[in-house]
């Protein structure tokens, strides 16, 4: 890889890392190409970026984007995106289904996060799911009132 290619990769990563709310670093050693393609497709559907890159290049991009403190060892695959939940869910779900895939560390909300935080975020409902729950709670009293009125109407009609 030439120096200009490395500079280009660093610039591209730096731009992505600056705009991201979450970066998850995972071990992918032993995964087949088919499984990696499955991860990329799933990530693409959820607006999550995935890239395998040398640790030195990733470290430079992370430092340039102001996200320091991640300890990078061995071979890593990086997942990042603007939505913390999407990134966490993609990584955690893929780890559940693949023994050879392992979440190592993450950078979430401006700080280094451990695996437990990534998995906890992955279990949280998405914004749309939360809105649906909220609407259900708001509609419950009206629904119960309507059911009560219909029951009263049916009782009056039967008398």
UniProtKB/Swiss-Prot annotation:
This is Large ribosomal subunit protein uL10. It comes from the Bacteria. SUPFAM superfamilies: Ribosomal protein L10-like (SSF160369). The keyword Membrane does not apply. GO terms for biological process: translation. Part of the ribosomal stalk of the 50S ribosomal subunit. The N-terminus interacts with L11 and the large rRNA to form the base of the stalk. The C-terminus forms an elongated spine to which L12 dimers bind in a sequential fashion forming a multimeric L10(L12)X complex. It comes from Campylobacter jejuni subsp. jejuni serotype O:6 (strain 81116 / NCTC 11828). GO terms for molecular function: large ribosomal subunit rRNA binding; structural constituent of ribosome. One of its GO terms (cellular component) is large ribosomal subunit. The keyword Transferase does not apply. InterPro entries: Ribosomal_uL10, Ribosomal_uL10-like_sf, Ribosomal_uL10_bac, Ribosomal_uL10_bac_type, Ribosomal_uL10_CS_bac. Forms part of the ribosomal stalk, playing a central role in the interaction of the ribosome with GTP-bound translation factors. Keywords: Ribonucleoprotein, Ribosomal protein, RNA-binding, rRNA-binding.
């Amino acid at each position: 890889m030439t120096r200009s290619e490395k500079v280009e990769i660093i610039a591209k990563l730096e731009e992505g890392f600056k705009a991201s709310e979450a970066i998850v670093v995972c071990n992918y050693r032993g995964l087949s190409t088919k499984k990696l393609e499955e991860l990329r497709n799933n990530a693409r559907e959820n607006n999550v970026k995935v890239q395998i890159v040398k640790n030195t290049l990733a470290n430079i991009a992370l430092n340039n984007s102001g996200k320091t403190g991640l300890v990078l060892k061995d071979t890593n695959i990086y997942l990042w995106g603007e939505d913390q939940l999407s990134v966490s869910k993609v990584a955690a779900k893929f780890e559940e289904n693949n023994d050879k895939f392992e979440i190592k560390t993450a950078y979430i909300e401006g700080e280094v996060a451990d695996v437990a935080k990534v998995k906890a975020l992955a279990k949280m409902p998405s914004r749309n799911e939360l809105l649906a729950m909220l609407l259900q709670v708001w509609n419950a009293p009206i629904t119960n009132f309507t059911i009560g009125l219909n029951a009263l109407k049916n009782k009056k009609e039967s008398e």
